[in-house]
Amino acid sequence: MTTVRTRIAPSPTGDPHVGTAYIALFNYCFAKQHGGEFILRIEDTDQLRSTRESEQQIFDALRWLGIEWSEGPDVGGPHGPYRQSERGDIYQKYAQQLVELGHAFPCFCTAEELDEMRAEQQAKGETPRYDGRALLLSKEEVQRRLDAGEPHVIRMKVPTEGVCVVPDMLRGEVEIPWDRMDMQVLMKTDGLPTYFLANVVDDHLMGITHVLRGEEWLPSAPKLILLYEYFGWDKPQLCYMPLLRNPDKSKLSKRKNPTSVTFYERMGFMPEAMLNYLGRMGWSMPDEREKFSLQEMVDHFDLSRVSLGGPIFDIEKLSWLNGQWLRELPVEEFASRLQTWALNPEYMMKIAPHVQGRVETFSQVAPLAGFFFAGGVTPDVKLFEHKKLSPDQVRQVMQLILWKLESLRQWEKERIMGSIQAVVEHLELKLRDAMPLMFAAITGQANSVSVTDAMEILGPDLTRFRLRQALDLLGGVSKKENKEWEKLLGAIA
């Protein structure tokens, strides 16, 4: 009997997302329920955005939740390497195999040619897609351009008529017309694979038997299925999980809800409660109980109990469930966990240098630096009253700074200050106009330790959360303002 093997394959391009944890949990439970194996693979072919720091955050977040893997970049295994950036020769081999079999072809079109092609198609009311012009080149022309070292990509051929039947473990057979599929790029000009080729090759070579992924990938499933057929490989069973939603039913996004697992750890949520809540996203226990452990979920896991309705990720409900877990802890464990969360030596050593020179007694530390040990803060709205800026301008400054910080890839004091400075300069203001607003939003006080030092220590998740809280306190941002200010954001260096 074939051993069930599932995997999670996140991209290390940002904070570890609760959506990644959600899909990892269901893959883990499915594998363990069937006595199988769960592995971790890192999809880091986006060399511009991928970082080892983000990769480590993924490891830490999943382990904090209690999800372990039997194979992966940090633990090794018989099917490595487990980072796609280290498997380049493997992808080159299989891309060339597809070309030799006549299922893929070199494409020499420049970015300008592709833009012009799409513009012409859109002008005609057509769906933009590659028109196959490289297929008209003779073999001699193709070889000449390859020998000359001309930059090119490798594209897959796709049918233009009929439908692809996608077997989904939740929905049954889903028919998707082939004319919706583009001639997907498989290998980029830099020699690195795109998601589609790397995904299929890795899943096959790593013996993955079942793939549980988000339903946003369902429309592109025909490309994956076609690649399995081109290679002559058995495809894994496919399951497209419902997406997590905001309370307003929109797709879960960090602009409306904190989406980083790290945020919930920093806020003092219990990992058991977080896993419990993610487990209830579109799934339920046979007896409908709300509180259950990871092992209990594994023991009773059945995909037939997954609901296709978009599960709502609601922080208030998560907080309620966390309270149930918290209050059932023995008091000794409660105290121990509290100490680990708030007073661990590593965190205290980040704070101490900024506080020590500002106090005369230990009793003065809490009033000065208590905000370091809180989730949110509750500043007095009067702290946002400004001599120079109107209330609307105050909200605009804070929203633009928040957006700039959301795009910050390296969370360092100098870069944080650079983001604030960029907004201030574009609005023709001074730093002294913006910094009191930052003090109020981040610390809840008129002054404290350096606010940029505080933001660096608190981290991106809590910093952005507090800025959102402050904006809500001031009345939020209307749709009209959001649209206008986003245009302004695009002009800020």
UniProtKB/Swiss-Prot annotation:
ATP binds at K254. InterPro entries: aa-tRNA-synth_I_cd-bd, aa-tRNA-synth_I_codon-bd_sub2, aa-tRNA-synth_I_CS, aa_tRNA-synth_I_cd-bd_sf, Glu-tRNA-ligase_bac/mito, Glu/Gln-tRNA-synth, Glu/Gln-tRNA-synth_Ib_cat-dom, GluQ/Sye. Its main location: cytoplasm. SUPFAM superfamilies: An anticodon-binding domain of class I aminoacyl-tRNA synthetases, Nucleotidylyl transferase. CDD domains: GluRS_core. It is found in: Cytoplasm. A motif ('KMSKS' region) lies at residues 251-255. It holds the Pfam family Anticodon_2. Its EC number is 6.1.1.17. It is an enzyme of class 6 (ligase). A motif ('HIGH' region) lies at residues 10-20. GO terms for cellular component: cytosol. Belongs to the class-I aminoacyl-tRNA synthetase family. Glutamate--tRNA ligase type 1 subfamily. Monomer. Catalyzes the attachment of glutamate to tRNA(Glu) in a two-step reaction: glutamate is first activated by ATP to form Glu-AMP and then transferred to the acceptor end of tRNA(Glu). This is Glutamate--tRNA ligase. The gene is gltX.
